[in-house]
Amino acid sequence: VRSGIALVRIATRLAATIPTLLFPIAHAHFGDGPHPVAPAEILTWNDEQRSVGFRSYADIFPTRTIRAGEITSPLVENHQDLSGVSYSWEGKTFTLDDYLQANRVAGIIVVQGGRIRFERYRLDSGPSTVWVSYSIAKSVVSMLFGAAIADGYIEGVKDPITRYLPRLAGGAYEGVSVEQLLQMSSGVTWQEDYVDPQADVSRLPSRILPLIDYMQALPRAAKPGTKFNYSTGETHLAGAVLRAAIGNNLADYLTHKIWQPFGMEADGNWMLGTRGGAEHAGCCISATLRDYARLGLFAMGGGVAADGSRILPPDWMAASTSPSPNFPGYGYFWWLREGGAFAAVGIYGQLIWVDPNNEIVIAMQSAWPSAGSRALAGQRWAVVDAIATAVNAEN
């Protein structure tokens, strides 16, 4: 019944505007078997399918709700017109407006000192739009590990992951620590190629036990802690470790440890591998743009709730955003930027950028024309730097 209602709802919403979406979405399946709209199929969506699909994950895939509480953490509006902010890219000068249009940005918000300095929506999005974050979920999982340590579920990052997930004993992840998993330095091979249907990222099972077995059967390429290799599969494995440690699902834990204590304004959702199953820890939390900004503020504040109570260990965010020994651009599922800034990044242009030194958070929801490239990422960082410079100059 639920799946039928969901299909009617999504088909009704889309029929009048984007007929090309009807075939892939109208055949979505909410049972325990494979989805005709498989997660990997998003890589073949066109621009219009992405702009609607990215705000409709709860209608297309199984999800679990992340529930907002009764109290919302306020964001004071103190706007500054940044639309004309200019930046240089490949010898040419562009404005922020140019960037938003050319890169199909659905929403951007700039917060400094708890004040909204700039907020803009496009692609039929608005403040209430719940948009998928893709790999931003990895950075959220990092913070949940901190919460689990504070709660006593995990003793520390030096623990072997087999302590919490004995099923991994004797396989590729034998001897890998929680810290090495968070730094993606397990030494286990993995192919994160979004255009290769035979790559590990495309072949990874959705069900959690087959996923664990797939990961532990992979060959080892390096000694743990000696080589960085970006792996969404490894983040899914981290989610399995976290679930085993806390004895709960990740969406509920996120609800009670961050979403409600920090005062998120709206319900979010987290994509599941199967109906009623485990969350994709490496992907696909959906939330409003302002709540993405609040996640950045929570991280920037070191993991303290709205009432001042501490959720994360005092040194957790500092450790999470410290350079890994063998890859200085990455911490505990966070990307590290210049000047002490750090970022949660998702494919197709999703971003939470945090600059603690200047108290700035920039969040973007986008539907880039491709999952990502050096050119798209380079231009994104150029515009982020220009925005930060303009906000600091005005402050």
What are these regions (language model features)?
Residues S83-Y99, G126-S128, A137, A148-K227:
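Active-site-proximal loop and beta-strand segments within enzyme catalytic domains
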Residues V132, D151-T189, A217, I246-G282, ...:
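Active-site helix/loop module of the DD-peptidase/beta-lactamase fold
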Residues A102-V105, T129, I347-Y348:
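Short, small/polar residue-rich loop motifs at catalytic or cofactor-binding pockets
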Residues Y121, P127-S128, V195-G276:
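Catalytic-site signature segments of enzymes, centered on catalytic residues
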Residues E265-D267, P314-I362:
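Active-site Gly/Thr loop motif
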Residues G114, W131-V157, L181, A238-L242, ...:
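Active-site SXXK
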Residues I10, F23-S125, D151-I154, L209, ...:
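N-terminal leader/targeting segments and the immediately adjacent pre-domain N-terminus
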Residues E234-V241, A281-V304, Q350-A367:
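Active-site-proximal alpha-helical segments within enzyme catalytic domains
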